[in-house]
A protein has these predicted regions:
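A short hydrophobic beta-strand element
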Residues: 273-288, 302, 448-452, 594-599, ...
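Hydrophobic membrane-insertion alpha-helices, especially the h-region
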Residues: 33-50
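Solvent-exposed serine/threonine-rich low-complexity stretches and specific carbohydrate-binding patches
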Residues: 139-158, 402-406, 483-488
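N-terminal Lys/Arg-rich, disordered targeting/topogenic segments
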Residues: 1-30
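Core segments of small alpha/beta cavity-forming domains
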Residues: 64-134, 179-183, 187-263, 357-416, ...
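Surface-exposed, charged secondary-structure patches
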Residues: 104-121, 130-138, 143-149, 155, ...
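Short loop/turn segments that connect beta-strands within beta-propeller blades
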Residues: 392, 475, 521-525, 568-571, ...
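Exposed beta-sheet edge and beta->alpha loop/turn motif
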Residues: 163, 168-171, 278-353
């Protein structure tokens, strides 16, 4: 094993699995300390340096002068869209920003009414609103089509009813981006909401939404078995499976949660995410309770995706009196359905038994977690909350601590899903809450460093959007905020910032924004730009984010660079990589080692289908730039290169008599050995009424504990003036 790998192995020995993250067409390896594959934005963990260095007495830099409750009444309203027939759909959540943003694209799809008067509900009364305005942009080029203020505002049922009138400036059938800006009287920054709109010339979505509402209203009613069987391809067969997952082919007992006494706690608001003349894809999320072991009520968040064929619809009058769910005779027809549910843990239920604890109903193993090197402490995220559990094998008594939660006085839970992300087949990729949490470090003393990002609904930063860096100290059981980074970005934009951040041992936090690496000093709260802008956005981070490689000179496009510069976030030093007159193709990082390819102008193939590069050589270089491994073979060229686990995968090509490239076979370059396992693992096991539930195991041992040992933090300490704006 080369010395270039050893330090990386030491840092990543807690890793149980790894996942691949791709960025702007360039395969990129980012280390996620998770057990399971993390998409978005469900979460993952970044390895970082200590927040504060004890022997340098830097702890004084976050001595605080105030305490603040984590929870409270949310000051970030939501917006619901309404159809032409006043059917509610597409609940929009916002983020703080002083100005409109032309780069944001909405996830939901709204049908404009035939008169282009789009009605919306806002979850605050009109007397709280200073101004309401909107922009419409062409997504193809970002050109502003319209910007106007909304003046038609009234109150109904404790909410604001507003009408957005879109002028006759958009083309029929073309999809546009709409951004709504809400300015509140008691909030300095505005709140932005994004969606997509289209003039559908009277075509509406009411039939499809009523289909979903009818399905949802009956799916947990055991008297409606025949109804659900006709709506899906379900059967009455017994099925020993996971209640948290179901699709259109699952047994009715699984889809309907028979024997679970399931009860919906809120009526869901469906979101349209794709629509054309033949097909509509909708998603929704809502809380459900069921009777668990001992008849105790448990809470689960259900996430669903529906694909509907739009065929045989009858007129509006007939639909009002007749069900739209009868074997596709008319109206929409369900062609795909998927459900993923995730249980929210209750402190009273948390206990360690036989070196493991139960996480209840979970659709998969996508749990963000990290353990200390000794395995005595495990941190994990569940239901928008951050937990730390102690095994009890050391000096500290075993048990659970909830380190962070936005659950507050307004009754809004932190586990509510705000976005159900689906793939092209209508299957659920991941689900995202209104905030994200990223675990940065768990020490052998039980101290935890983590980041919270998104629109802060409560606490000191309520109404603001940004990233907070926090540290929990085991000795005094206190949580302290080190720095707050105010960022006018949506949740996905902030997720990207956090995924690529790095905190070194000197209290310097590195983030990448606008294709540049920037440094935030959390001792004096200054922001400094450390690198030039990456050419053609060609860049990559090492798995622990301590190294940042970026293109500094172009090489005729095609994703090639004449020079790649590597910046070290621990030392502040840079080094350049060149390959003579050849171009460099940045593939990504594997551990702390940089992987890149080499090609010349003759290896760039340009045609009507696009541009493709064929590499003559693949190089793996350590942190000092030394080649630790390379692959090169006379007469062979390599393309379709990506990093997967501990290998570099690629396709081999040769040249024909005409000089064209011809595919030969596929190959892999083994780059390194696997690291050591962590202090925890996840696995499903048989249960009673719930069939299968997820358990987290302590791989290095644990003593039994009970839920009575759980400790819930409800406040954190902060210091005024610790805010940096980017």
């Amino acid at each position: 094993m080369s010395r270039g790998y050893k330090k990386t192995y030491k840092k990543i020995k807690r890793v149980q699995r790894e996942t691949e993250y791709r960025r702007k067409g360039f395969p990129k390896r980012t280390l996620y300390l998770v057990l399971g594959i993390v998409g978005g934005a469900v979460a993952a963990a970044i390895i970082a340096g200590n927040l504060l260095v004890a022997n340098k007495k830097e702890e004084t830099n976050i001595e605080t002068d105030s305490n603040i409750q984590m929870g409270g009444v949310s000051r970030i309203p939501y917006i619901d869209m309404l159809t032409e027939h006043d059917t509610i759909y597409n609940r929009l959540t916002g983020y703080a920003s002083k100005n409109f943003s032309k780069d944001d694209i909405g996830y939901t799809y709204a049908y404009l009414p035939s008169d282009r008067r789009q009605k919306i509900y806002i979850s605050v009364t009109p007397d709280k609103i200073e101004k309401l305005s909107f922009q419409v942009r062409d997504p193809d080029n970002g050109v502003l089509v319209e910007e106007n203020q909304v003046t038609e505002i009234s109150e109904a049922g404790g909410k604001t009813v507003a009408v957005i009138t879109v002028k006759d400036l958009i083309n029929s059938g073309h999809i546009y981006n709409m951004q709504i800006k809400l300015d509140l009287k008691d909030q300095p920054a505005g709140i932005l909401y994004n969606t997509r709109i289209a003039d559908t010339q009277g075509d509406q979505i009411d039939r499809e939404i009523r289909y979903i509402n009818e399905f949802t209203g009956k799916v947990f009613n055991e008297n409606e078995t025949e109804f659900i069987s006709k709506a899906t391809y379900a059967t009455d067969s017994a099925e020993s499976s996971n209640y948290a997952y179901a699709d259109i082919n699952s047994a009715t007992s699984l889809i309907m949660w028979k024997g679970m006494s399931a009860q919906m706690q809120e009526n869901p608001v469906p979101s349209v995410i794709h629509s054309d003349k033949d097909t509509v894809v909708l998603t929704q999320s809502y809380p459900v309770t069921y009777k668990g072991p001992g008849e105790k009520e448990e809470r689960v968040i259900v996430n669903e995706a529906f694909t509907l064929e739009r065929e045989g619809a009858k007129d509006e009058e007939e639909e009002e009196t007749t069900s739209v769910l009868r074997e596709g005779e008319y109206g929409p027809k369900l062609t795909s359905y998927e459900r993923k549910a995730y249980e929210t843990l209750d402190a009273r239920d948390l206990s360690i038994t036989k070196e493991r604890f139960c996480m209840g109903l979970q659709a998969d193993e996508k749990v963000q977690c990290m353990s200390s090197e000794t395995g005595q402490y495990i941190c994990f995220v569940n239901g928008g909350n951050l937990w730390r559990v102690c095994s009890g094998t050391g000096t500290e008594k075993g048990g659970f601590v909830r380190l962070f939660s936005f659950e507050g006085d307004d009754g809004v839970k932190t586990d509510i899903t705000e976005l159900v992300d689906v793939n092209d087949e209508g299957k659920i990729k991941n689900v995202r809450g209104r905030n994200g949490i990223r675990i940065l470090e768990v020490t052998d003393d039980g101290d935890v460093t983590f980041a919270v990002y998104g629109a802060f609904p409560a606490g000191k930063h309520e109404g603001e959007s940004g990233i907070g860096i926090y540290r929990y100290y085991t000795k005094d059981k206190k949580l302290k905020e080190a720095v707050f980074i105010k960022a006018s970005k949506n949740l996905e934009g902030m997720r990207k910032l956090v995924n690529e951040c790095y905190l070194n041992d000197y209290g310097e936090l590195y983030i990448t924004t606008d294709s540049q690496l920037k440094k935030i000093n959390i001792k004096n709260y200054t922001l400094e730009t450390m690198t030039r802008k990456a050419v053609n956005d060609i860049s990559s981070h090492s798995e622990d984010n301590s190294k940042y490689a970026y293109a500094t000179q172009d090489y005729g496009g095609a994703g090639l660079a004449s020079e790649i510069t590597v910046y070290d976030c621990d030392t502040g030093e840079s080094r350049a990589i060149r390959e003579g007159d050849e171009g460099i193709y940045l593939i990504g990082y594997m551990g702390g080692d940089l992987v890149y390819g080499v090609a010349g102008v003759d290896e760039i193939e340009r045609n009507t289908g696009g541009t493709k590069v064929y590499l003559k050589k693949i190089v793996i270089a350590d942190k000092d730039g030394n080649e630790v491994k390379f692959y090169e073979k006379d007469g062979e060229y390599f393309s379709d290169v990506y990093i997967e686990n501990a290998t570099v995968a690629f396709t081999c090509y040769g040249k024909n008599d005409g000089g064209g490239f011809v595919k030969k076979d596929t190959n892999r370059l083994v780059a390194r050995e696997e690291g050591e396992g962590g202090g925890c693992s996840l696995r499903f096991d048989a249960s009673d009424i719930r069939r299968r539930v997820l358990y987290m195991d302590f791989t290095k041992g644990a003593n039994d504990s009970t839920g009575e040992d759980a400790y819930l933090l409800d406040e954190y300490e902060y210091m005024d003036g610790n805010t940096v704006e980017i």
